[in-house]
């Protein structure tokens, strides 16, 4: 009976939610909310806390899907199958508890590099927490993403232009 209730798609477990999320504020001195781990921007945290589309307990199915995604993303096959010429950008706050304060990101980058992916850029934002796009220095983050995209899209366009040039006939 317990398993049937627990794994019902609409069941919401406060216990499971606490097990997953509760420790994320652990390294924050005097947190004001349970969501302070998301961002240093108090206005963003306040909006998050008051938004019913953000502030809710996952369903059992939601947690199952989250854990499935994490498992697949960390599967060695994923790293092996990644195209070796695929440019990757990793961005993270160095105070993000989900990424284990940079350790998880560095581990992931090393796994990609160990599987032959060479074109990887990593940016850690000082004192930023989990949601780097909602942090106090988000304009810097947006600029870094824009620069990275422009650089890689321009390089791709240049490669495609060279590939499409007609070969000149030998004289």
Where are these regions (language model features)?
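Acidic beta-to-alpha connecting loop that harbors the catalytic carboxylate
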Residues: 94-97, 128-129
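Short beta-strand/loop motif that positions the catalytic acidic residue
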Residues: 90-92
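Conserved alpha/beta-hydrolase "acid-adjacent" motif
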Residues: 97-107
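Alpha/beta-hydrolase-fold enzymes
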Residues: 3-53
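Catalytic active-site module of serine/aspartate enzymes centered on a nucleophile-bearing elbow/loop
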Residues: 115, 119-171
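Short, proline-enriched alpha-helix->beta-strand connector loops that line the catalytic pocket
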Residues: 82-88, 115-118
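Active-site nucleophile elbow and catalytic-triad environment of alpha/beta-hydrolase enzymes
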Residues: 59-80
